A protein has these predicted regions:
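C-terminal accessory domains and tails appended to enzymatic cores
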Residues: 1-44, 48, 118-245
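Gly/Ser/Thr-rich loops at beta-strand to alpha-helix junctions
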Residues: 3-9, 58-60, 74-76, 104-109, ...
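Short, glycine/charged-enriched secondary-structure capping and boundary segments
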Residues: 14-17, 66-69, 82-84
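General beta-strand structural signal in soluble alpha/beta enzymes
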Residues: 24-27, 53-56, 68-71, 94-97, ...
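Long, hydrophobic/aromatic-enriched structural stretches that serve as scaffold segments
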Residues: 46-80
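Short alpha-helices
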Residues: 70-128
Length: 245
């Protein structure tokens, strides 16, 4: 059962097709990638001897005993990327392109650079990832307009996004030391203070309002988990860490 769609999930689906594996794709995004979206499939297989694999699905319902979670976020952040986990289950080796997809998913551009990726390879992977996430030409244009109004707080760049798609903003601003992108409904921070922010917002992480991943390279809030004023308050707390540097 596939979770929210991006380049990694797209490649996982391709692997499953190429190896004749049965799977379900509810065409989910990161906001609605919940286990309950597959309640019908789970009900049909819960009492069988077949293992049910859920890939990056938030467990908003209790999974059956034969359910196995594949993930590398939050409490599963010490595990390999989901693409690597699926490849291991299928007993196959990833090719160069797939290795770059996995690196991109867990560590963004720096992780691809650590594999010796060329500028052309990085650009191709990032473009493919944005397209898989549903980024449109209009989103790309709005990203440029958003960047034109960025705010700088020492090493922290703050951008209020005019689009819900943050990736075209990230890609255009890279490299950066720390980046915070937000709207009235959500927020994502990219930088090396994630461990400190995990401590600061531990209560919200435990209540699944805040998530993190990418080897502690990013931290975000679930869409509509906080009011606009609460988001501004969270931004203020993060800014304070940089103002005191």
């Amino acid at each position: 059962m596939l979770g929210g769609y991006d380049l990694e999930m797209q490649e996982i689906e391709r692997l499953l097709i190429n190896h004749n594996c049965s799977y379900s794709n509810a065409s989910l995004n990161w906001q609605n990638a919940h286990l309950s979206q597959y309640a019908h499939e789970i009900s049909a297989l819960s009492k069988s001897d077949t293992n049910i694999y859920g890939i990056e699905l938030f467990e908003d319902i209790t999974p059956p005993p034969n359910y196995i979670r594949i993930d590398h976020h939050n409490d599963f952040s010490d595990r390999p990327t989901s693409l690597i986990q699926v490849a291991e289950l299928l007993n196959i080796e990833l090719n160069r392109y797939q290795q770059l997809i996995a690196a991109n998913d867990v560590g963004y551009i720096p992780a691809m650079m650590s594999l010796g990726a060329s500028t052309e390879e990085i650009s191709a992977i990032r473009l493919a990832d944005r397209q898989a996430q549903g980024v449109t030409d209009n989103d790309e244009e709005l990203a440029i307009k958003s960047i034109n109004n960025l705010e700088q707080c020492n090493d922290l760049i703050i951008v209020k996004a005019l689009t819900p798609k943050f990736s075209p903003i990230c890609d255009r601003l890279f490299p950066y030391k720390a980046l915070l992108i937000y709207t009235d409904q959500e927020l994502t921070y990219y930088g090396d203070l994630v461990p400190k922010l995990k401590q600061l917002f531990e209560e919200h992480i435990n209540s699944h309002k805040i998530y993190y991943g990418g080897n502690d390279s990013y931290l975000g809030i679930a869409k509509k988990a906080f009011s606009p004023n609460e988001i501004i308050n969270i931004i203020s707390q993060i800014k304070l860490l940089y103002e005191n540097v």
